[in-house]
Every structure is written in structure tokens, then in C-alpha cells.
């Protein structure tokens, strides 16, 4: 057993014997001076740990955002154009199912089926974008389905605009009208929600990061909780909260700009 005197000496050295309020105020003061302390585990600077983790999470989320944007545009157009036939019903059902599937199940299934059984994409030893593609893809599936349905409904509303009526009078086909006239209007209405979802993706990436062993912010949080590494926990949660706030602010700004633009038109 560790001597009680030694324990008290360590508590005093780390400032853990002071009142919680004092510890919190000291932490805020250190934060203002960009000093988040050192890790209890390896004594590394917390800013360096969080900085490297933030890079990993940002790569996953940005790649996932690209996949969601491209996939949602394609799915949204197909859902609208095939809404009256069997293919449309199948796509609508598949979209609902995709939204309902948890990310951790997609990630474990991806490793089991795509990587192990089919041996199509390796989940280890990759470099560049391929290192983040499996995690980003699993994170993007639900978003593609969600925004695909949202875009489909927005396209349906946009198809009642006067510009669409004039395009039909000119004899243009429905697929061309959707891509040229309805889709831009639909995108405008979904951009703010898309930005908010990106903030949620940063917070929700912890599951796929741990499954694919990518040392992002979520991965660091789980490991720090296991090791009771308080400085790293505080810093990672702070950065995730800050990212959520930033994405929400960006969503509000974009929404106001788009409303101003539409009002000007």
C-alpha cells in the first residue's frame, strides 16, 4: 500500500486538496493563459495531445461531410424522381433503415464483412485518406439517409416554384429540372441543418474512433476516462463543446445569409 503521507504530498502538489471552486477558478485562469497542464499518464502537454487528436477527428468529420453531401444529393434526387414506383419505395425504406442503424453496429459489421470476409478494404496499416475512409463512411451512412430524405421533400416543394413551371413549358425533362432548378433551392434550405449535424458528428465520432483505433478526440476521452486522466478529459470535452458552439454559430450565420439572399430575390 502507498503511504498516506505520500498520497497527501501528491494531492498538495497537484492542488487536489484545495476547494473545488478554487480548483475551477485556477483551471479557468490557466485556460486563459493557454495552459491546460500535463497528462497524468505520460506527463505530455495536454495541448499537444488534444492538437494531434483534433487533427484525427477533423479528418474523419470532413471526409464524412463530403460523403454525406455527395450521397445525400444523389439519394435526394433519386427519392424524388422514383417516388411513384417500386424503386422509390425500396429507397425510402432503405433510408429509414439506414437512419435507424447505430454507428457502432455499422462499424463492427464493416470490419467483419468488408474487411475480414470480403477483404476489400483493410482497416489497419492504411495511409492518407484510406486511413479515415472506413470510419468516415460508417459515420456518414445515417447522415446520407437523413439528408437524402430532407432534400427529397425540399425538392418536392421547390418543384411548385414558377421557375419550374416555366421550365416544364419549355419541354425540359424532370431530371434536368430537378438538377438545374429544384436542387439548388433544396440545398439552400438544408445547409443550416447540415452544419449543425457536422457539430454533432464531431461529438459522435468517439464510437467509430475507438472501433477503428483512430486516436481522435473521442478516442482520447474514452482512454482518459479509463485512466482517470483529468487534464486530458477536461481539454477534450472543452474542445468538443467549443466545436459544437462554432458549428451552431456557423449554421445561424449561413441561415441568415441565405434568408437575406432569398429575400433580395
What are these language model-derived features?
Residues 31-35, 117, 201, 214:
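A short secondary-structure junction motif
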Residues 50-87, 103, 127-265:
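Alpha-helical transmembrane segments of integral membrane proteins
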Residues 17-73:
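An internal, D/E-rich "acidic patch" concept
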Residues 5, 15, 19-27, 45, ...:
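Coil-to-alpha-helix initiation sites in intrinsically disordered, low-complexity, charged segments
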Residues 1-22, 114, 118-134:
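Hydrophobic alpha-helical transmembrane segments of membrane transport/permease proteins
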Residues 29, 93-122, 138-142, 149:
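Membrane-water interface segments at the C-terminal ends of transmembrane alpha-helices
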Residues 7, 25, 94, 251:
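Generic structural marker for isolated residues within well-ordered, non-membrane alpha-helices
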Amino acid at each position: 500500500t502507498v503511504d498516506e503521507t505520500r498520497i497527501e504530498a501528491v494531492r498538495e502538489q497537484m492542488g487536489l486538496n484545495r476547494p473545488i471552486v478554487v480548483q475551477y477558478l485556477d483551471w479557468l485562469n490557466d485556460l486563459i493563459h493557454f495552459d491546460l497542464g500535463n497528462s497524468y499518464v505520460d506527463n505530455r502537454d495536454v495541448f499537444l495531445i488534444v492538437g494531434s487528436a483534433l487533427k484525427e477527428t477533423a479528418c474523419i468529420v470532413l471526409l464524412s461531410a463530403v460523403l454525406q453531401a455527395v450521397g445525400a444529393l444523389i439519394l435526394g434526387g433519386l427519392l424524388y424522381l422514383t417516388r411513384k414506383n417500386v424503386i422509390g419505395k425500396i429507397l425510402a425504406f432503405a433510408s429509414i433503415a439506414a437512419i435507424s442503424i447505430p454507428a457502432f453496429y455499422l462499424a463492427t459489421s464493416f470490419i467483419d464483412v468488408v474487411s475480414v470476409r470480403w477483404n476489400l478494404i483493410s482497416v489497419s496499416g492504411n495511409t492518407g485518406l484510406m486511413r479515415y475512409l472506413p470510419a468516415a463512411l460508417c459515420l456518414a451512412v445515417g447522415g446520407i439517409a437523413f439528408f437524402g430524405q430532407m432534400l427529397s421533400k425540399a425538392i418536392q416543394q421547390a418543384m411548385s416554384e414558377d421557375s419550374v413551371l416555366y421550365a416544364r413549358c419549355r419541354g425540359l425533362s424532370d431530371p434536368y429540372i430537378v438538377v438545374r432548378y429544384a436542387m439548388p433551392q433544396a440545398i439552400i434550405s438544408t445547409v443550416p441543418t447540415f452544419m449543425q449535424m457536422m457539430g454533432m458528428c464531431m461529438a459522435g465520432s468517439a464510437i467509430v474512433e475507438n472501433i477503428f483505433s483512430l486516436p481522435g478526440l473521442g478516442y482520447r476521452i474514452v482512454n482518459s476516462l479509463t485512466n482517470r486522466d483529468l487534464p486530458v478529459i477536461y481539454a477534450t470535452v472543452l474542445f468538443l463543446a467549443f466545436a459544437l458552439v462554432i458549428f451552431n454559430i456557423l449554421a445561424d450565420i449561413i441561415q441568415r445569409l441565405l434568408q437575406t439572399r432569398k429575400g433580395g430575390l
